[in-house]
Amino acid sequence: NEKYVVTVFMDITCHYCHILHQQVKEYNDLGITVRYLAFPRAGMNETARQMEAIWTSKDPVFALNEAEKGNLPKELKTPNIVKRHYDLGVQLGVKGTPSIVTSTGELIGGYLKPKDLLAALKESAQ
């Protein structure tokens, strides 16, 4: 049912990222596949180290879901993958989270409800 793929730069401490993540099934039901990249808004700090532990865990989806419930990783890791995600975000002009990048490279800053994102994706495809 995939019609669109978006990449979301997110931070595990971001309120609107939490809302977006809670609605990921609604995005999927509308044909929008959501992929995540880490973008710790405060740079390479403790949050970045927590995000690295999530992204490098044996089951990153489970680890992210747990973090979204407040169960943050106990083990912190040096942010290598997260640093690459962050640097890419900076190059693309990401200034905050969530930031949504479409498959055509368009940057949508901020949270959009599932139906609003679908409308924006349809409009940009024309």
Question: Where would I find each of the regions flagged by the language model?
Answer:
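Short, solvent-exposed mixed-charge patches
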Residues: 124-126
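Aromatic/hydrophobic pocket-lining residues that form the small-molecule binding cavity
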Residues: 17-20, 82
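Short active-site loop/helix that positions an aromatic residue
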Residues: 121
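Short hydrophobic alpha-helical module
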Residues: 30-33, 57
